[in-house]
Amino acid sequence: MEAFTKHTGRAVPLRRSNVDTDQIIPAHWLKKVTRDGFEDGLFEAWRKDPEFVLNRPEREGATVLVAGPDFGTGSSREHAVWALQNYGFKTVVSSRFADIFRGNSLKNGLLTVVLDQKTVDALWELVERDPQAEITVDLEAREVRAEGVTASFELDENSRWRLLNGLDDISITLQNEADIAAYEAKRPSFKPQTVQV
C-alpha cells in the first residue's frame, strides 16, 4: 500500500447525497478480486450522461473527490474503494461517510476526510468556479487547505499511522513473519499447519 502523507490535486465536485456502493460500482463488476481494472465501472450508470461531472474535460486528471453527505452507504464492497483508486482519486472529502465504506477505504489506502457541510460547500463553490483550483489534504497536519479554506479534520491514531506508513493488514502481519515461522516450526506435526504454495 502506498503511504499517504500529503496530497495536492484538482477536485471533482460530486453534489449528490446518499451515494451508495452500487452507484459507485455496480454489482456486475464484482466478479474479480484483483484490485485493478475497475476505473470504467466507477459511477458507470451516471457516466452514460455526457453532462455528468466526471465526463467534463476540465475534470480529467482530478485526484480529490468532494462528495455529498452519506457517501458510501449500502453494501460492503472493497471494489467501490478500488474503483475510486483505479480512476485516480487519492482522497474523498465529505461531511459524512458510511462506517463500513470508511473502514474499507482506510484499510485500502484511500483517505476519507470528514469536514463539516459548510466547509464542503465552500470547496464545491471553489472548484466549480475554478476547475483548476487545487485542494491540499495534509494527513501529517490533519488539515485541508484550498484558496479561502483551511479546515482541520480528525482521524483515529491507528488509521493515521497505517496511512502515513503505507501499511495494510497483510504488511502489518508480515512484520512478524520471523516470529510466525518460528512458532509454526515448533508446532506438533498432528496440528494444522500453514504451508506456502
Swiss-Prot record:
One of its GO terms (cellular component) is 3-isopropylmalate dehydratase complex. The keyword Electron transport does not apply. Pathway: Amino-acid biosynthesis; L-leucine biosynthesis; L-leucine from 3-methyl-2-oxobutanoate: step 2/4. GO terms for molecular function: 3-isopropylmalate dehydratase activity. Coiled coil: none annotated. The keyword Lyase applies. Pfam families: Aconitase_C. Its EC number is 4.2.1.33. Keywords: Amino-acid biosynthesis, Branched-chain amino acid biosynthesis, Leucine biosynthesis, Lyase. Heterodimer of LeuC and LeuD. Belongs to the LeuD family. LeuD type 1 subfamily. Catalyzes the isomerization between 2-isopropylmalate and 3-isopropylmalate, via the formation of 2-isopropylmaleate. This is 3-isopropylmalate dehydratase small subunit.
